[in-house]
Amino acid sequence: MNINQYLDSTYLKTAQQAGISESETENKVKELVNEAIENNFKLAMIRPKFVTMAREMVKKANSDTLIGTVIGFHEGTYETCEKLAEAQQAINDEVDELDYVVNYRAFKEGKINLVKSEVFKGTKLGLDNDKAVKWIIEIATLTNDEIIGLSQLIRDVVLDNFGEENAQNVFVKSSTGFFKTEEGKPNGATFEAMELIVENSKPLQAKAAGGIRNYDDAVKMVKMGVTRIGTSAAKVIADGGKTNETY
């Protein structure tokens, strides 16, 4: 299996989070994008501020590697209008894919109409501009029943408003990789959670983010029906190695 075409190679830490300078962060992003281009990874996933730079790098290399960014990251509690403004700026900067953090807290509080409205508006903006859209549901905060319910909500909003013909361009994604769990519990994709997402979001696509640390696990995810894998160790996984990175 050519696992490279399933990999979204990812660097999302801010300079403060990584304990490095802004220029060092920019260099890390450049390294990630170059690595994605050289290894023909499906996509490089980066913060919005780096989209323009990354786009220029991909153009210069005449590469098919896509550029993706995160919206409403990482808490997901931004007002919908703020998420849409951030997404529109990324579109203006020539991003290929938009990974929104859904307002999972609102979902847990029973504010279903708010979540439906957000999913509709965010998806419409992306699809109207020929961008793939992913909805991060942050599985570490959800029960299995909530994973099922939120996956079904996103699926139903997309199918009811945009039709099955757009299902291949919308994903339910597991995790941000930034949620802090207690007692060493995983904050990224698990096989159990991804099985629930795949079964309850199809015909939409599914992205497993975080927690995949080796080639065999990546292949197992794909065979389960996962169509993208977000990881900060794409090269290690592609080369058949194992990583201790949490995302």
Give each language-model segment a name.
Residues 1-80, 92, 153:
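Conserved N-terminal beta1-alpha1 strand-loop-helix module at the mouth
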Residues 2-14, 43-46, 65-72, 98-100, ...:
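Hydrophobic faces of well-ordered beta-strands that scaffold small-molecule active sites
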Residues 11, 69-71, 80, 92-107, ...:
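Glycine-rich phosphate-binding active-site loops on the catalytic face of alpha/beta enzymes
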Residues 18-23, 180-188:
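Short, flexible/disordered intra-domain loops and linkers
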Residues 33-53, 98-116, 138, 172-186:
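Glycine-rich, proline-tolerant flexible connector loops at the mouths of alpha/beta enzymes
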Residues 48, 52-73, 112-134, 141, ...:
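Alpha-helix-loop-beta-strand connector modules within alpha/beta enzyme cores
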Residues 75-89, 109-120:
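Glycine-rich anion/phosphate-binding loops
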Residues 78-93, 142-153, 194-204, 212-227:
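Catalytic cores of alpha/beta
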